């Protein structure tokens, strides 16, 4: 949801979804197959290497921001038409996060998205680049 949901603490930029106590996981017993992977030193090393490769290229902060800007440019006038037809900016529509009420313009929404993604990636850098 990239920070735009009011459940399972999706507005948080830190933490893994599967570790959220409100989320029961894939298995009614609480064990998920990927938890076993996270106990494997070989897997963790491969994960770290892969993360660092992507962060140095297509998942760098600059590349992600450019991708967001590219999407905005591609959408062009459709953005304005969308909010003329559905004037929802500044409204909390489930499952939007509660902070949506403070974002009253499209620029506010884009700024929030960029900020949220950047903060999320910084947290992921800390935990995946050990």
Model-derived segments and spans:
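Middle-to-C-terminal accessory/interaction subdomains
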Residues: 1-130
């Amino acid at each position: 949801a990239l920070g735009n949901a009011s459940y399972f603490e999706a507005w948080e930029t830190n933490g893994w979804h599967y570790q959220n106590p409100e989320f029961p996981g894939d298995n009614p017993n609480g064990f998920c197959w990927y938890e076993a992977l996270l106990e494997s030193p070989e897997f963790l090393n491969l994960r770290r290497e892969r993360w660092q490769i992507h962060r140095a290229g297509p998942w760098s902060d600059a590349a992600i921001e450019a991708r967001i800007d590219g999407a905005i440019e591609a959408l062009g006038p459709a953005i304005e038409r969308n909010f003329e037809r559905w004037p929802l900016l500044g409204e909390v529509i489930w499952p939007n996060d509660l902070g949506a009420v403070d974002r009253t313009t499209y620029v506010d929404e884009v700024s929030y998205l960029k900020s949220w993604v950047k903060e999320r990636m910084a947290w992921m850098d800390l935990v995946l680049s050990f």
